[in-house]
From Swiss-Prot:
Pfam families: BBL5
Family per record: Belongs to the BBS5 family.
Biological process according to GO: cilium assembly; intracellular transport
Top-level lineage group: Eukaryota
Organism: Giardia intestinalis (strain ATCC 50803 / WB clone C6)
UniProt-recorded name of the protein: BBSome complex member BBS5 homolog
Cellular compartments annotated: Cytoplasm, Cytoskeleton, Flagellum axoneme
The entry's keywords: Cell projection, Cilium, Cytoplasm, Cytoskeleton, Flagellum
Listed GO CC annotations: 9+2 motile cilium; axoneme; BBSome; ciliary basal body
GO molecular function: phosphatidylinositol-3-phosphate binding
Length: 443
């Protein structure tokens, strides 16, 4: 038995110019508020205005910005789990300096989102890269609601940050009190089995404990030491399988999940990962490279009351399937105003499916105007190329690995020299006299 589950979690992803299907609301996600006419300040200042202005939509899992003028859907999707800081910024008069990243630190403006030349600044990290996004409204109507938006953004971010237990596996946390698990809101205990062993991936001997199956997660804890415990939310499970014990006919019930920093003893060796199978389940490997995989194996040989492992695996499987079909992410904030959830992450000028023009909607074009069909095609091509080549690198502000020059102090050959192509936003191994991938082509 081995069941693989889709792991489409937009709150964990940071996507730039994502395909249309990545901007569709996932199960359990709902739109909270939307504002039109928002400028992406860090976009290339040479591109058309229709590419720099768009719609901001805030959901319970992410903040999405969608260009109103790009036929291929220039967009930004920032998962709330990737955000490290939210602040109020100060726009420079010289936009070229602003895009280059030369900025002044300004104290927050008493919770106001925008006043005059103020903007909202999002700092985020994803795949060991630091990103910075800056959004500024262009309409008077948006500015009048600035305080409302910033307060909602802060409230959603805090609510998401304080409900991690719904979405993230925790080890050795405060989830047990006086021999009983501390339940979440709306959580119900379905079954409880004693004397089930937890096996570590590095071969630590079994530790017997209580295996609790609830409506939201699996909880295991040791009665002798309640601080030794595990909480596994169903929405965070990558796979569920039965694994044979060497030298025995018995099997282990194994959960595979994305690892956190405090799970070193449960990390799986790379050669045991079935990466092709994981990628096959709808998410197509999005964000998978940023995950280490941890495995939690449970031994039911001494379970009280006795239960066949196949029966336990089937009941857990049903709970996971039900929870992932209708996930509860824990964030409870009512939507502000009327938001059409069918197209919540798409601007009002675009349809939810193909990012085309909705029936009955008049599209006002900006930039070069022409009456010829060929001219219109050229304009669309320019917009599409600009969004794919100029935007992504503009948001990267720091890196803990490849981008930039990495040289040894003594110029030794033990380290690679990496160069970041500013146009494509791709890091590559450089040679003397080469500053871009285009230069490599000329060779």
């Amino acid at each position: 038995m081995k069941e693989i589950f889709s792991h489409n979690r937009p709150d964990k992803l940071l996507l730039i110019d994502a395909p249309a299907d990545a901007l569709v609301l996932v199960p359990g996600e709902y739109a909270i508020v939307r504002f039109d006419g928002v400028e992406d300040v860090r976009a290339d200042p040479t591109v058309l205005d229709s590419l720099r202005f768009g719609t901001v939509t805030l959901t319970n899992l992410r903040l999405a910005w969608n260009s109103r003028g790009d036929p291929n859907g220039h967009s930004i999707s920032v998962g709330l789990s990737t955000i490290t800081k939210i602040s109020v910024g100060n726009l420079h008069r010289d936009r070229q300096q602003k895009v280059a990243g030369l900025e002044e630190s300004v104290p927050p403006d008493n919770g106001l989102f925008i006043t005059g030349n103020r903007s909202v600044v999002l700092h985020a990290t994803f795949n060991q890269l630091g990103y910075k996004f800056e959004l500024k409204p262009s309409s008077r109507e948006f500015t009048q609601q600035n305080s409302n938006f910033f307060n909602i953004l802060q409230a959603v971010y805090r609510a998401h940050d304080t409900t991690r237990m719904y979405r993230r596996v925790r080890v050795r946390s405060s989830i047990v009190r006086d021999g009983q698990p501390i339940l979440l809101s709306r959580e119900v205990i379905l079954s409880s089995i004693s004397n089930i062993g937890l096996v570590s991936a590095i071969g630590v001997s079994n530790v017997l404990g209580v295996f609790v199956r609830t409506s939201h997660r699996i909880i295991w804890f040791s009665p002798a030491n309640e601080s030794y415990n595990v909480s596994i939310p169903y929405v965070d499970v990558l796979s569920l399988s039965l694994k044979e014990i060497k030298g025995s006919d018995d099997k282990l019930l194994v959960f595979s999940i994305p690892a956190n920093d405090n799970m070193k003893e449960f990390l799986s060796p790379c050669n045991e990962l079935d990466r092709k199978t994981l990628r096959a389940k709808e998410h197509r490997g999005k964000g998978l490279s940023s995950y280490s995989i941890a495995t939690f194996a449970f031994d039911v040989q001494k379970a009280t009351p006795s239960v066949p492992i196949q029966s336990l695996a089937q009941s857990v499987l049903i709970s996971i399937q039900k929870a992932q079909a209708q996930p509860d992410y824990g964030v409870e904030i009512k939507a502000q105003g009327s938001v059409d959830e069918a197209s919540a992450l798409v601007s009002s000028e675009q349809s939810p499916g193909g990012f085309g023009v909705q029936a009955g909607v008049e599209v006002v074009k900006t930039g070069p105007q022409t009456n010829s069909k060929d001219g219109s095609k050229v304009l669309k091509i320019i917009q599409a190329v600009a969004s794919r080549t100029n935007f992504a690198a503009r948001y990267i502000v720091s890196s803990s690995c490849a981008p930039g020059h990495v040289d040894g102090k003594d110029g030794g050959s033990g380290k690679l020299t990496m160069t970041l192509d500013d146009v494509l936003g791709v890091a590559f191994q450089s040679v003397p006299g080469i500053d871009s991938i285009g230069d490599l082509w000329s060779l």
